[in-house]
């Protein structure tokens, strides 16, 4: 009020005319500050102390006349020009007018002597008259308005809007009226610059937080202060520029719920399942067995990782059984007994150096290896003979006229008759090799051409009614050989450990 008196009183104007040094430089700008026609233009010294220009949105419908009267009555309006003009006051005031001196002293006493530090904070800008509503919360304007307009607003439906809560509320809720002569064109330009920038969602957008914020924002609609009359065009401008942040209504997201089946559908499904189970239970065992075998074969094939090949039946069934026995990891007792003789014969030949075999004369490999359990044509075992040389192996049993060991098969496996052991009435110990005359080898002579000794039989020589299981040749075509390692080497036949690898290999 005191500052108003100094500007309105007649003595002050007369002293100003007489003593121009007491007048404030550029005093013409002071009354122009209250007119809404043109913005204030201060000197360089005043621009240094002038607070930062605040780009806020003003509305043309405001009554500027009432605003001028309010500014004249508020003492805070006159404090700002007094602060800026005290730097040019003279050190000793003139004594022409006592009233002006007293008013100036009072005004100077109110001015703080500290240095002016403007940090562009909203608290110092708000010292000027701001028409605020009674419900306005000044704590929202703690952040500087310059920061709100300088940084780009990157808004999208997936953007965390909580970061821009203060800035958006400041721009949209309240029109900041710093001075009645605010430049409206500059404010609109700054708002358009902010909103025309590309809206790009940050990579780390928090969707749940933005949804909650939007829902809260629509529950409490923004209302302008009662003292301000905001036109509808401003809202249309904002809604056109930033469509992402404006949601018409806070509606919950639709949840895609699968319709539950009706009771009739459930009953029909349960009935179908029961019928399927009954059909499976009443199905034929052949179908289930075939499916099980196919599944087992497929599983075994995947496990081994090899391709299956079609099995071609052999002409002779005994060969199939022999092949199965050869490829088994653990032989049964019968097959193990058969190959155990071969194994024992090979080990004894390596130890003694005498290789005894039964083969055709022109073969390089033996059809059978002779061991201690092998039987001679005379009916005695090899261990019952005495090995003198390769040409003399007489039988040591009394009253036996056998002078040379002659091998004869004593087991049905050696002649390829594997099926005989499957008969219930078959006795392996009673089995003997027979001649075509239907008599056994024991009923033939042990020497010479082995004529038949049965009364009334006119068989002059033994002719086997079986074939060799190794070469499919008759018994009389084979011979028994007693050889040493040197003989084997000269005949280019396997010896040593090679005998175990090359058994039953015909010429």
UniProtKB/Swiss-Prot annotation:
Keywords attached to this entry: Phosphoprotein
Ranges of compositional bias, category Polar residues: 88-100, 182-193
Residue numbers spanned by region Disordered: 1-100, 154-310, 486-507
Location of Phosphoserine modifications: 270
Compositionally biased region (Acidic residues): 167-177, 208-222, 270-281
Keyword Phosphoprotein belongs to the record: yes
Domain of life of the organism encoding this protein: Eukaryota
Family classification: Belongs to the FAM221 family.
Identification of the protein by name: Protein FAM221B
Gene: Fam221b
């Amino acid at each position: 009020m005191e500052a108003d008196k100094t500007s309105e009183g007649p003595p002050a104007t007369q002293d100003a005319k007489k003593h121009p040094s007491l007048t404030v430089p550029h005093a013409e700008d002071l009354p122009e500050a209250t007119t809404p026609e043109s913005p204030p233009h201060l000197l360089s010294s005043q621009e240094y102390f002038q607070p930062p220009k605040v780009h806020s949105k003003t509305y043309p419908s405001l009554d500027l006349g009432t605003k001028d009267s309010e500014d004249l009555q508020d003492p805070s309006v006159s404090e700002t020009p007094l602060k800026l003009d005290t730097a040019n006051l003279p050190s000793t005031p003139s004594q022409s007018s006592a009233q002006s001196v007293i008013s100036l002293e009072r005004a100077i006493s109110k001015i703080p002597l500290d240095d002016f530090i403007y940090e562009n904070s909203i608290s110092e800008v708000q010292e000027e008259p701001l028409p605020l509503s009674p419900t306005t919360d000044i704590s929202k304007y703690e952040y500087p308005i310059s920061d709100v307009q300088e940084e780009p607003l990157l808004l999208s439906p997936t953007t965390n809007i909580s970061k821009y809560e203060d800035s958006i509320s400041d721009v949209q809720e309240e029109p900041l009226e710093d001075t009645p002569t605010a430049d409206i064109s500059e404010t609109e330009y700054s708002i358009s610059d902010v909103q025309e920038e590309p809206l790009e969602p940050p990579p780390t957008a928090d969707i749940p937080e933005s949804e909650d914020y939007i829902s809260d924002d629509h529950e409490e609609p923004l209302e302008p202060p009662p003292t301000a009359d905001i036109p509808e065009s401003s809202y249309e401008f904002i809604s056109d520029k930033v469509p992402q942040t404006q949601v018409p209504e806070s509606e919950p997201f639709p949840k895609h719920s699968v319709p539950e089946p009706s009771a009739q559908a459930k009953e029909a499904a349960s009935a179908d399942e029961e019928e399927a189970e009954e059909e499976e239970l009443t199905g034929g065992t052949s179908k289930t067995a075939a499916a099980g075998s196919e599944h087992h074969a497929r599983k075994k094939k995947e496990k081994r990782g090899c391709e299956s090949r079609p099995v071609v039946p052999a002409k002779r069934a005994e060969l199939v059984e022999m092949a199965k026995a050869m490829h088994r990891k653990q032989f049964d007792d019968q097959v193990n007994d058969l190959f155990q003789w071969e194994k024992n014969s090979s080990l004894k030949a390596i130890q003694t150096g005498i290789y005894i075999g039964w083969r055709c004369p022109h073969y390089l490999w033996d059809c059978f290896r002779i061991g201690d359990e092998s039987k001679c044509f005379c009916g005695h075992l090899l261990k019952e003979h005495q090995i003198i040389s390769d040409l003399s192996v007489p039988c040591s049993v009394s009253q036996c006229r056998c002078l040379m060991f002659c091998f004869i098969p004593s087991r049905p496996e050696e002649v390829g008759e594997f099926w005989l052991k499957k008969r219930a009435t078959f006795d392996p110990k009673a089995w003997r090799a027979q001649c075509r005359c239907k008599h056994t080898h024991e009923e033939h002579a042990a020497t010479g051409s082995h004529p038949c000794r049965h009364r009334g039989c006119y068989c002059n020589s033994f002719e086997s009614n079986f074939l060799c299981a190794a070469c499919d040749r008759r018994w009389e075509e084979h011979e028994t050989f007693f050889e040493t390692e040197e003989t084997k080497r000269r005949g280019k036949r396997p010896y040593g450990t090679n005998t175990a690898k090359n058994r039953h290999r015909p010429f």
